[in-house]
């Protein structure tokens, strides 16, 4: 996933993105590191909306 790159492009820090999506900053960090997490489609949709991209762009 390209969460870190997309987040930085939007000039958001992890806490700001987490607040917009309704998850913890720690979970954003795990997503960005590629930790063994399996976000739901609902969460991917919220992330994509917050980052102003499609879900497909998010998971490329």
Give the label of every model feature segment.
Residues 4, 15, 45:
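Short glycine-/small-residue-rich flexible loop motifs, especially phosphate/cofactor-binding loops
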Residues 6-7, 33-36, 47:
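Generic anion/oxyanion-binding catalytic loop in active/binding sites
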Residues 8, 19, 49:
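Alpha-helical residues within the helix-turn-helix
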Residues 12-30, 35:
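Short alpha-helical DNA-recognition segment
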Residues 42-57:
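DNA major-groove recognition helix of helix-turn-helix/homeodomain DNA-binding modules
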